[in-house]
């Protein structure tokens, strides 16, 4: 990861009823070497990614199926994404 391109994506994962979902694994499916994060007890997460290009956020927690969301992330930015509901 080039430090001059580092960006942060912040977001929140919710259950279908609107509650924050703890322990969801969030990763960049296009750059698995960048690691992953887990959502906190209120469903919020922060993940460090290489900015300046596409990111495929992958969300996973049993018993829910894995889901993904494609984003373009500018470099050197903190990006807040919309609430994400597990189905």
Which role does the model predict for each range below?
Residues 1-22:
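Beta-strand-rich domain onsets/edges
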Residues 1-5, 82-87:
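Pro/Ala/Gly-rich low-complexity, hydrophilic intrinsically disordered segments
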Residues 22-23, 28-50:
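Short, acidic Ser/Thr/Gly-rich low-complexity loop/linker segments typical of extracellular
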Residues 29, 50-86:
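A short, solvent-exposed loop/turn motif at the edges and junctions
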Residues 12, 25-27, 58:
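Residue-level detector of beta-strand face positions
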Residues 2-4, 38-40, 48-52, 72-74:
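Surface-exposed coil/turn segments at beta-strand junctions on protein surfaces, enriched
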